[in-house]
Amino acid sequence: MTSPIVTLKSVEQQQDLIITPPTTGLSLTGKITIPGDKSISHRALMLGAIAQGETIIKGLLLGEDPHSTAKCFRAMGAEISPLNTDKIIVKGIGLGNLQEPVDVLDAGNSGTTMRLMLGLLASHPERFFTVTGDSSLRSRPMSRVIKPLQQMGAQIWGRKQNSLAPLAISGQSLQPIHYHSPIASAQVKSCILLAGLSVEGKTTVTEPALSRDHSERMLKAFGANLEIDPQTHSVTVMGPSRLTGQTVIVPGDISSAAFWLVAGSIVPGSDLLIENVGINPTRTGILEVLEMMGADLTLLNQREITGEPVADIRVKHSQLKACTISGDIVPRLIDEIPILAVAAVFAQGTTVIRDAQELRVKESDRLAVMACELNQMGAKITELPDGLEITGPVSLKGSQVDSYTDHRIAMSLAIAALNASHSTTIHRAQAAAVSYPEFITTLQQLCQ
């Protein structure tokens, strides 16, 4: 009887993931269902909470981050059914009707929860809110949303000159703004648009490049009056708005699919079908880069579900080649850069990633961590101020590596370990549950 390829070991309330590829080689075949899109799940819960009437959400991500969002909005008066089934019911309380909570709102590890919620809290006059998060979130920059909100008249206080949580918010009647964001960030854009829902007049956000547009699509579906100018990367909300509850079907998260897209590309003999993947054009940078690297990808059964394009994606093993990733495409694949770094390790030539300094202020410094941990396994990666330089292909060797409690690091290292010689131990692998609770189980099933 052969030993299992993927095993979990509990160590002092942490979980180590041990991956030991067979000496005869490994191939991955079969169908994969991925969890609901995290970005869309957050927004469905939030808009459902502030809409009039009932919102039904199907396919919601049941990970830790949406639980944090639901918990916060329950504390402010919204009724949200338990996040343990495929059908979640949200009974909204209407725009401007969030109640002052009796305790601190805890966003957990979720930057999306904290940043988007700030736009709503700041626009609730005569109510006081305090927001915190875990140690990772308390170290992530919040000034990028606080500064534009303050320009609208918001009163927000925090550590390090109002840039770090915990944050205290005294709700105000805000003024409209035309904000030119220095970075392309869906969280910044969404925060300001959510604040603008309650403001008399036009609130506009202009970005230097296109960021993901899930908020715009969903706000329109819920009845908000939006104007979008794709030429100038501008979005305007006309307030005050009235939102009405909707039925939202959440597609699979392309950021979660990315791990299997790379695994199928780099593990010899692999042939995977990933079902029900959201292919919103503001998120498909991962597909464009993998195709540029020579990946064998086929989009099947393309369709639209509640305003979001969806497809099944087939990926087969191929010989990858290096490429350059920079400029306007980076905001469209920012969360996928850790797993693209893994792909680059096995690609012929030198892959250069630039304009990705945003990764230094995620759940971990993802540029530094991916360079350090993959180099530990034998990769040839040079860290740049805003990216990475990766020379391949190399043969990775099993090692002891750490997720730094960052879900995307944990899963990226697990995929790298599939193509390494000997055993790899990934410390604190339980972090994967933040966005993909079934990741380790799916990995075990594929490797049987």
Curated annotation (Swiss-Prot):
Pathway: Metabolic intermediate biosynthesis; chorismate biosynthesis; chorismate from D-erythrose 4-phosphate and phosphoenolpyruvate: step 6/7. Its main location: cytoplasm. It catalyses: 3-phosphoshikimate + phosphoenolpyruvate = 5-O-(1-carboxyvinyl)-3-phosphoshikimate + phosphate. It holds the Pfam family EPSP_synthase. The active site is at residue 335. One of its GO terms (cellular component) is cytoplasm. GO terms for molecular function: 3-phosphoshikimate 1-carboxyvinyltransferase activity. CDD domains: EPSP_synthase. 3-phosphoshikimate binds at residues 38-39, 43, 185, 187, 335, 362. Phosphoenolpyruvate binds at residues 38, 111, 140, 187, 366, 408. It is found in: Cytoplasm. It is an enzyme of class 2 (transferase). Its EC number is 2.5.1.19. InterPro entries: Enolpyruvate_Tfrase_dom, Enolpyruvate_Tfrase_sf, EPSP_synthase, EPSP_synthase_CS, RNA3'P_cycl/enolpyr_Trfase_a/b. Keywords: Amino-acid biosynthesis, Aromatic amino acid biosynthesis, Cytoplasm, Transferase. One of its GO terms (biological process) is chorismate biosynthetic process. Monomer. PANTHER family: AROM/DEHYDROQUINATE SYNTHASE, PENTAFUNCTIONAL AROM POLYPEPTIDE. HAMAP family: EPSP_synth (MF_00210). Catalyzes the transfer of the enolpyruvyl moiety of phosphoenolpyruvate (PEP) to the 5-hydroxyl of shikimate-3-phosphate (S3P) to produce enolpyruvyl shikimate-3-phosphate and inorganic phosphate. Belongs to the EPSP synthase family. This is 3-phosphoshikimate 1-carboxyvinyltransferase. It comes from Gloeothece citriformis (strain PCC 7424) (Cyanothece sp. (strain PCC 7424)). The gene is aroA.
